[in-house]
Amino acid sequence: MSERGAITCFNAHQAATVEAMAARIIPGSQDDPGAREADVIVYIDRALAGAYGHLQPLYRRGVEALDRRAAESHGAPFAECSEAQQDALLGDLLADVAPALDTPGVDEDTSLLSYFAAVVHQHTIEGMFGDPAYGGNRDGAGWKLLGFPGARWGYSAEEMRYGFDSGQIPVTTLEDLRRQRAGRR
């Protein structure tokens, strides 16, 4: 779990499950950061404590339903399944995003799980590529992956030149800009 921030909305099991989901959506390692290394779980937790607070019940019910599905399929809660098993479960859920309950063969858990997986997928993307001020994208990992230099006051003529490698520009966050501005006063 993250060293940058305390988890406040999730209990330890829920946090481990959502973090495992995010880590399969954007896998990584220490040398090639993914969602786990970029602290996406911190972003999701902070979002649920704030603007996305209305989604807390979805996350709680979603984790419970995902664990039931994982136990039925693989005999263990989702966070304890192998990466291959997690990939298979998530792949199935994301392939059929939020099927209607009146669809033949779709039960309440399947509909809930597909919607839940889609929301976690969206929040994982937000947490990986949003400004680090919101809890995820630790050290600009997502921005570095894209070659995006982050928040800027502007660009030089050289940086605007066609073919310029923006990966040469140091990553700058909103907090970096605030510090720069405060230093000018």
Give the ranges of each region predicted by the language model.
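Mature-region segments of soluble proteins
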Residues: 2-4, 14-16, 20, 39-185
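Short glycine-rich loop/turn motifs that provide flexible caps or phosphate-binding loops at active sites
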Residues: 33
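Glycine-rich, often acidic-flanked micro-motifs
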Residues: 29
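Substrate-recognition/specificity elements adjacent to catalytic centers across diverse enzyme folds
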Residues: 24
